[in-house]
Amino acid sequence: MRMFRITACLPSPSKIRTQRELQNTFFTKLVPYDAWFREQQRIQKLGGKIIKVELATGRPNTNTGLL
C-alpha cells in the first residue's frame, strides 16, 4: 500500500482561546495515498503547516519513529 509519511506542525487549540503564548504541536503520521488531499486540507484548516512529506510503505497507525 502506498503511503505518505508527513511531518506537520499545528498550533495548540487550548492556547488559541486564551490568546496567550502559542504552543505548537509537531507530529509524524502515515497517511494513505488516496487520503492525502483530505489530510492536507484538514491540517491547513486548523492553521497548521506541513513540514515534510515522504513516500513510505507500511501499515497505518504505526509509530513512524521506528521505521
Curated annotation (Swiss-Prot):
GO terms for biological process: photosynthesis. Pfam families: CpcD (PF01383). Residues 1-56 form the CpcD-like domain. Keywords: Antenna complex, Membrane, Photosynthesis, Phycobilisome, Thylakoid. Coiled coil: none annotated. SUPFAM superfamilies: Allophycocyanin linker chain (domain). PROSITE patterns: CPCD_LIKE (PS51441). GO terms for cellular component: phycobilisome; plasma membrane-derived thylakoid membrane. InterPro entries: Allophyco_linker (IPR011134), Allophyco_linker_chain (IPR011064), CpcD-like_dom (IPR008213). It is found in: Cellular thylakoid membrane. It is a peripheral membrane protein. Rod linker protein, associated with allophycocyanin. Linker polypeptides determine the state of aggregation and the location of the disk-shaped phycobiliprotein units within the phycobilisome and modulate their spectroscopic properties in order to mediate a directed and optimal energy transfer. Belongs to the phycobilisome linker protein family. This is Phycobilisome 7.8 kDa linker polypeptide, allophycocyanin-associated, core.
